[in-house]
Design a protein with these regions (language model features):
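A conserved helix-loop-strand patch within extracytoplasmic ligand-binding domains
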Residues: 102-154
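N-terminal segment of the mature folded domain
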Residues: 69-121
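Ligand-binding pocket segment of bilobal, Venus flytrap-like solute-binding proteins
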Residues: 74, 80-84, 155-230
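Short, polar/charged alpha-helical segment
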Residues: 40-59, 167-169
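Short helix-initiation/N-cap motifs at beta->coil->alpha
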Residues: 39-40, 58-73, 180-191
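Sec/Tat signal peptide C-region and signal peptidase I cleavage site
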Residues: 23-29
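Short, well-ordered beta-strand elements
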Residues: 30-41, 58-63, 149-153
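C-terminal lobe and pocket-closing loops
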Residues: 212-258
Length: 258
């Protein structure tokens, strides 16, 4: 009951944000052309906003599923008006590239977008793994294709987090012992969950809010591991031992952009 109440408050909050912002930057249009992110955890917010806009009397087309780099270009040229899946600061560069034609408007969730790397708790405890660098000595434990490197589910091409992950790889030399898997994220995570259920070790990037850490419970099934150095203003969260973990990613604001 308490969880349901929390969900209802969240829904009311989303609708109130739409009303407050009034979509002033696209209200001149006869039709609002919506986009949505190509990660499935963004579908829910997009649908809530679409229905709220329609209740306010707007005609809404879409949402059209798009990668971030595609959305911001399309929004700058007027091919699409709005999406509610902006992650700022990860997406700050896209805003700069739009030269003022696309801007964040309102908030879905302030500082609610955490990102980072997780491994199965069993392996973390067995090998004493605290950071991504600790993977190096035990990379074969996550090697699925026999190349000697740990296979880690990462971000598909075109996602903002792909650039942050690449920065970590460049700064820390992670490519020497980790292979980033950039296939469809949902399909890759379905494979991760299947492996975990079959007793195999898993290593993956994820973010919150996300169904992945609902299925694989934080502190029970999986734990965050630290990025010991990064130029990002890294978010910190408690892990299973209540210590603080430097995630290597900033805590993003999830915001509409139009």
């Amino acid at each position: 009951r308490q969880k349901l109440g929390g969900h209802m408050k969240y829904l009311k909050y989303l609708v109130s944000i739409v009303t407050a912002m009034s979509i002033s930057c696209v209200a001149f249009a006869n039709e609002i052309k919506m986009g949505r992110a190509d990660w499935d955890t963004g579908y829910f917010q997009a649908e809530i906003y679409k229905q709220a806009l329609e209740k306010m009397g707007y005609k809404v087309s879409g949402p059209k599923t798009m990668k971030p780099q595609v959305f911001y270009v399309a929004a700058a040229t007027g091919d699409v008006d709005l999406w509610v899946n902006g992650w700022f600061g990860t997406h700050d560069g896209y805003i700069s590239e739009s030269k003022g034609k696309v801007k964040p408007v309102g908030h879905v969730m302030k500082k609610g977008g955490l990102q980072g790397y997780l491994i199965d708790k069993k392996s973390a405890d067995k090998f004493g793994i605290k950071t991504v660098l600790d993977i190096k000595k035990h990379a074969k434990n996550w090697d699925s294709n026999g190349d000697g490197k740990a296979d880690m589910v990462a971000c598909p091409p075109g996602w903002g987090c792909e650039k942050v992950i690449q920065k970590h790889f460049d700064e820390l030399g992670l490519g020497e012992f980790i292979n980033p898997v950039k296939a469809d994220y949902s399909a890759s995570m379905a494979d991760v969950i299947s492996k975990y259920k079959n007793g195999k070790s898993v290593l993956f990037y994820t973010w919150t809010p996300n169904w992945t850490v609902g299925t694989l419970k934080l502190g029970k099934d999986v734990v965050w591991i630290e990025v010991p150095y990064s130029g990002s203003k890294a978010g910190k969260v408690p892990n299973a031992t209540k210590s603080k973990v430097n995630l290597g990613f900033g805590a993003d604001d999830i915001r509409p952009a139009a």
